[in-house]
Each structure stands twice: as structure tokens, then as C-alpha cells.
Amino acid sequence: MKKVYSFLLYILGLTTFAQNSNNEQFPLFHDCEGLVGKQQESCFYNTIQNYFYTNYKIPQELQNQQYKGTVIVLFEVDTVGNFKVLYADAAHELLKKEAIRVFESLPKVAPATYSGKATYSKFTIKINIPLVAPNSIDGNESTKYAKTNTLLIDNKKELSEYDNIQYKPFENPQFKSTGIVQFSHQNYGVFDALLNQVGSNNHTASKPYSYDEVAKYYDLETANQSFLKKKDSWWGRKLWNENVVAIQGEEYWFTLNPILDFRVGKDTESQASNTFVNTRGIIVNGGLGKQLTFTTSIYESQGRFADYYNAYAESIRPSGGNPAIIPGIGIAKRFKEDAYDFPLAEANIKYQPNKFINLQLGYGRNFLGDGYRSLLQSDAASPYPYFKINTTFWKIKYTNTYMWLKDVRDAVTIDGTYTTKYMASHYLSMNVTKRWNLGFFENVVWTNTNERGFDFNFVNPLIFYRTVEFGSSSKTGNALLGLTSKYKWNNQINFYGQFLIDEFAISDVKESNQSWRNKFAYQIGAKYYDAFKVKNLLLQVEYNQVRPYVYSHSNPITNYGHNNQSMGHLWGANFREFVAIARYYRGRYFADAKLIYGQRGFDFNDGTNNFNYGGNIYLDYDENRPYDNG
């Protein structure tokens, strides 16, 4: 792991740069001319404080009450040097009006400049009531203490740094940031049509998207404004319109919101009274400058599902005694007698040094494809740690993802510790024409055989993984190749598909004997936006077929899985599936309808028929295989 950290630091080091603050200048009053740097800043604030002390008139009725308090004013200096109050806050309206009057009477100044050009500048000032005469401090306090150790700390003195922190009105900066838009098919369906217009030069297969990618085609901020309700109370505004906590300052912002979700249902074939999911959580989003964004969310849930779902969750339970793994979430503990307690955490830190490259360090899931399912890399498994590099230029987007996965079976658990395995993939997406997109996918899974660890042979994003795999021993790695394609018939209809090769033997293809060694999968689908001229109605059909033994390996630990779940299609292998979906939304309301029909090949495991028919990706495909052909 030390090598991994060194590599990440090296990548980040390549993108750092220094900024020169000497090209910035504060607004200048006439008396401040000739000063430079911090002297300009001090003179600017001192002049305003002096002006307020001289000209601010406290209303007589407040003087009679011996009122004590503060007035906070957010103001700007425009490009010609005029002062303008943006926001004033005080306990009494008279105090705010007087502050605005004083600002309007301030003399015109030389505007702030950046790189020699006049620019707008914003400031915040705090005025104490009653007024206090500005004190001029001779010399720098820190210099005094540095020169001698005979000065005692003044317990009555307070620094003003905390009080001088400047805040701005929250302007929803996340909608224009490089932050991640949380992925779900329902959420992305709102703007999917606009991203898939003929002639667009984007890449929709690699998900999740960032806000700035979506904002080119869909105005997220305007859409958010259209959802707002007329609410005046604090509770009403926070419930319907605003973030519970939202802070924006100079070059930074962050939000914090609680998550509450309660669902109840009924399984008619179950003896349980009902099904339910009760979720509480918190989500934090933020940005530091324009290049660094972050998001993290923590969920705590209890739930009881339909009997068939409970049975599946328990069938993939981990080593160690926990009763189940909730698909797409993680390991669950027992809750009461027939329910589960399952936490979930996801996080992403994204650094974008320029418009071509972004680096992401996260704990979550990724998705490759334009369909409802993905055969290459889906979001069906539990979250995992990953490092991702996106490179976008010309007509190309190149995505490299390095993942740390877990095998939680009894057979590979040592001293209560689950086995770690590694996965590296790269996906090259190219817009061949204004209608046709073509993508190439390579992936390899390997383990810590012979203390191999994270093999840096796979870090090079341009290398052909299959060649490296055999150079490192084909028995300790598992490689897959894939192809994706999308064709935009017009702005309403597009067709998409995927083809995955796990293993392929040309000799068996020529014999047409349906050899088990020809392990491949494919997907075809179509989307119809604003179907039948109904605004915001999306219709989608999709067919998926995965042959037996796809995603599996002779050494099960190097299969295409994580936490006893498939990293590809969630059904694993040996199946056919047809999906039909209708989605409709209007304002805050949405409706989804899905029809899923499938045929799957299962193992019997009844003591007599214990063959491996190729559906369970956690079985060795060289053992108990009933047929080689057919």
C-alpha cells in the first residue's frame, strides 16, 4: 500500500502550481495611495471604521435604552469605485437603514484590481453598538513577542480573526461545480435526453457525471428554482427549499443535510405482517476553490424485505456469523428476530487541476454503459475503495479505475480477516461521428499471491492487460475485454449495446459446438424520449444475455466479484433477461414502471446433482462441469 500512496502523491504533485498574490490590489481611498500589500488592506478597513465612527448616528430611542449589539454589513466596491450594500443585518431596522445611509455617503475610491484590470470586490464589516473609537496599534504584535520573552499574555485581549471571517449569501455553487451528481437511473433520467442530442460531444457511458458536465445541457439551478415552494417559516424553508446547513465564503462552500426515508410494503406470500425499510443518515457536500470538491454520506438502516429477497441476502452471507449481505449495500446484522440492521457509507474527493484531467479518490460504486444494466461494470455490488482518473480531450474520454475488493467466503477468510483482491480497468470512449459513439473496455482482477500486492504492472493506463496478465502468470489473474456502442437515430431515439468477452477460443467457434470456453455476454437496447409526444416520458427496452461461466475463474478468488456479488450483471451468469421501463416525471413527482422477464440456469445441489452449471460465479469452472459443449 505504501507504493500506492506514493503513486497517488506523485500524480497529485504533477498538477500543483503556485499563485502570485502580488497582482491583486485592494480598493484605495485617497489617503491610502502609495501603500502596498497588507498596508493597503489595513488602511482600507481603518478608513471605513473611522468613517463610521464619525458619521454613523445611533437612533435616539436606542441610545435612551443603552442598547448594545452589532450591525453586520456585506458590501461591494464595483469596477468604478462605488460602494453598494448587498446585505445588512441588525436587531433593529433603524440600525440597518443608518448603515445603508452611511455607505451611500462614502466617497468614491479607486476600484480593486486583479492582473491590472478593475474588478468587483466584496467585503463584510462588523460595527459594534455603541460605537468604539478605532485603535491604532503601533507595530506588529507578533513581532513584539518574537523580540522578547518578557511580555506577559494579555488575558483581556481578543483577536479579531474569528469575527472577521467573511460569509456570502449562499448561491448554490454546487450546481456549477466539478462535484459528483449522485447516480441513480431515476435521477439521471431527468436530463438523459438533453445529454443524448445529436451532435453533442459528451460521453454518457461513464457514470457518475459531474455537475459541470450536466450543466452544459441542463440548467440544474433553474430546475431547482422551479421546485421551490412559497414558505416563510424556518421549518418550511428547510423542509422544502433549502439546505439545513449551507455556508459559502471566499472560494469555499459546504452543505449538510439529514436523510430520512421510511418505506412499508406487503409480501402477500409471507407470514410477516409487512416489509419495511427505515433509514436515517446525513450527507455533506463541499468545495475548496474551483478544483477540489468532496461529498460524503452515512446511512443507518433497518429493514425486512420480501421472503425471496431475504433468502437471497442470507444465501450470500459472509464468513464470521453475520446473517446476510444486503445486495448493493453490504454486511448486515440481525435486527429483532426477522429483520436486518445494515449501515452504508459512501465518499468521493475529486481534484480537477485543468479541463482535461480529474482525479477521484472514493468509496462507492461506478457504472459503465448507457443501459439499465451493465455487463462491464455495474453498481449492483457493495461500495468499495477506488481511485479513478478521467482524461477528456478532442472526441475522447479515457477512464482508468483502480479498485480494492473483498472476498468474504469462509474458504478464504483467515483469522477473521477477509481476503483483499484488486481490480484495474480502463475504458476508452470515442465519438466517431456526431451520432455514433464507440467504447473499448479492458479489465483485470488479481490477488495477493506470493505477496504480490497491488501490482504496478497494471497501473500504466495504456498497457494491454491481457498481455501483462500472462506475463505475471495467467493463473493468478483474470482479464476481460469489452466493447460498447451507441447510435443516436435522432434527438428522441437512440440504440445502445455492449459485448463482453471473458474467454474465447477461435477453434471452438469454427466448430460451432457452443463450447463452454466461449464465455461472452451481450446487451442490446433502445431509449425513446418524450415518447408519443408526451413531455418527460421515457420508454426503454433492453435485452441481456450472459453465457455460462462468464465472470468466473479457475481460482474463484479472482472472479469478477466483490462481497459475494457480481461486479458485472447482478444475476451473475447463465441467463437471458428482457427489461421494459417507463419513466415519467413532473416537478417534484415521478413514476417508474418496470417489467423484467428472465430465464436463469441454477445449480441443483441436492446431493445427487451437484454439477456446476455456470450460474454461480464463485465456483471453479474446472470442477463439476457437466458438459463441455452445448
Model-derived features: positions:
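Sec-dependent N-terminal signal peptides
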Residues: 4-14
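Charge-biased low-complexity segments
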Residues: 5-6, 18-150
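Surface-exposed coil/turn segments at beta-strand junctions on protein surfaces, enriched
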Residues: 66, 114, 118, 287, ...
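Residue-level recognition of well-ordered beta-strand positions that form the cores
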Residues: 74-76, 128, 285, 498, ...
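A mature extracytoplasmic/lumenal domain signature
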Residues: 75, 87-90, 125, 131, ...
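Buried hydrophobic packing residues in well-ordered domains
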Residues: 78-81, 361, 428, 497, ...
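Outer-membrane beta-barrel channel domains
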Residues: 156-437, 443-448, 511-520, 527, ...
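Exposed, low-structure sequence patches enriched in small/polar residues
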Residues: 249, 342, 434-630
